[in-house]
Amino acid sequence: MPLGSPEHLSVIARADANARRIADAVRDTTGGDDVLLIVASDHGHETVERIIPLETMLIEAGLKDGPDSSEVVVASNGFSAHIYVADEARDRLGGIEALLEASDDVDEIFAGDALARVGHRTDTPLAFSITAWHSDGANEFGVKGLNGAFEDPLSGETRINAGQHGGLGPYEQHPFLIVRGGGFGAGV
């Protein structure tokens, strides 16, 4: 559903009401104990502006043998994707990197030692971790953050104009955090 739409705001209101019920139940059942309640999300969302057919791009460029081949594998994470390359296809790394660099849909490319900067090991078949190009544009409901989602042939959940996550866009990097309880100083 589109971010900021009446349906979306209704879902958020129900989630807020449930969080309130839990917080009140914790408060009412502590029996005098000092409880620190923390409620958080692990990410925010941005609007899917376009779907990027990364696997198809690799196949059409001759860098992946076909949709069912396993020498080069694409794993979509929404607004980011990982590209795994088997030992027998390592000679394609330069071509894959050139394709990614030439694509207007790709923003950041992490490869080699740069993979460690984003929490990945560098001694596995993971060759590239990439993010989609994103903008500060707003959707039809005025919610900022438009992004490209990498197509996932195994899932039909990603939809144009709906919310998604998985990249490094500034608006999806704004999770919420609510803290209630004693022993936690203001501003800490």
Residue ranges with predicted function:
Residues 1, 41, 131-134:
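Short, well-ordered beta-to-alpha junction loops that form the rim of enzyme active sites
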Residues 25-26, 33-86:
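Acidic/histidine-rich catalytic neighborhood
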Residues 20, 43-44, 163, 181:
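Glycine-centered flexibility sites
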Residues 70-188:
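Active-site neighborhoods of enzymes that stabilize oxyanions during catalysis
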Residues 1-37, 95, 162:
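A long, amphipathic alpha-helix that forms part
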Residues 7-10, 14-17, 21, 48-49, ...:
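Generic recognition of stable, solvent-exposed alpha-helical segments in well-folded globular domains
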Residues 2-8, 52-58, 143-147:
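Short secondary-structure boundary/capping segments
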